Amino acid sequence: MTAEIAKFGHIALITPNLEKSVWFFRDIVGLEEVDRQGDTIFLRAWGDWEHHTLSLTPGNRARVDHIAWRTKRPEDVETFAEQLKAKGTEVQWIEPGEEKGQGKAIRFRLPNGYPFEIYYDVEKPKAPEGKKSRLKNNVYRPSYGIAPRRIDHVNVWTTNPSEIHQWLKDNMGFKMREYIRLNNGFVAGGWMSVTPLVHDIGVMVDPKGQPNRLHHFAYYLDNVTDILRAADILREHDITIEMGGPGRHGISQAFFLYVKDPGSGHRLELFSGGYLIFDPDWEPIEWQEHELQEGLIWYGPEMKPGGPMDDTTEC
């Protein structure tokens, strides 16, 4: 049976100012602190069932420790390990409990250096009394901060996106949903998923020529009014909203608001809307160079090439 990826699981970040990063993600964004292991703090949104969807660890510079994907079956982890090794990829085994709340996993790097993790076994702790939702199909009751529902996607940049698109398709079963093709034929970005979401991962070209960078990761809010409320909360705490405010992407049809963690500089997208794909024979949507601006910004603040939105952090 072919090994399959089920979903985007979590992202593990290194931050040079752990205290400020925890303040931002826990107290302002409204993620729940679930657990601690040494200096690492594990968090999740009120609708996330798995042990954590974000971990924060102190370090001397901001970088991504790993981007994690959950498989559909327990045996898929071993199968992925064997397939990757057969193709010459170095695979590191992570023992149960080495990452709090998680079973046996593998870590490896893509050809351009992205650090990935694949796992299946994971704890799903219940919310403590006093935070538990009265709705049996929720984990926590949303009670403070921006309070996104769940983790959504990750967006990474590299020098040649097409190579990574093909690698993800061939090795992990991702499907292309939308992409940008320039006049010279170069594919500048692609939005891919293994779920019905319009994207679980976006891979785009880095205009600075860096091979393995994190542009942002995203948490999902239920509706656009939550995005507007998030903007108010950020401004009340004197946190800069990138590009000056929220807007809507043409690609993915999603509403967005971008903000950097003041402790690390890692960029967070607060994301709402989008669309789901159920067609097994989906034809990827091509955006051409003359349509690029509408694809990136359907309406809202202008995203200027060479501006602050080109900033990324290390993978």
Curated annotation (Swiss-Prot):
It catalyses: biphenyl-2,3-diol + O2 = 2-hydroxy-6-oxo-6-phenylhexa-2,4-dienoate + H(+). One of its GO terms (biological process) is catabolic process. Its cofactor is Mn(2+). Its EC number is 1.13.11.39. Optimum temperature is 85 degrees Celsius. CDD domains: BphC-JF8_C_like, BphC-JF8_N_like. Catalyzes the meta-cleavage of the hydroxylated biphenyl ring. The enzyme can oxidize a wide range of substrates, and the substrate preference order is 2,3-dihydroxybiphenyl > 3-methylcatechol > catechol > 4-methylcatechol > 4-chlorocatechol. This is Manganese-dependent 2,3-dihydroxybiphenyl 1,2-dioxygenase.
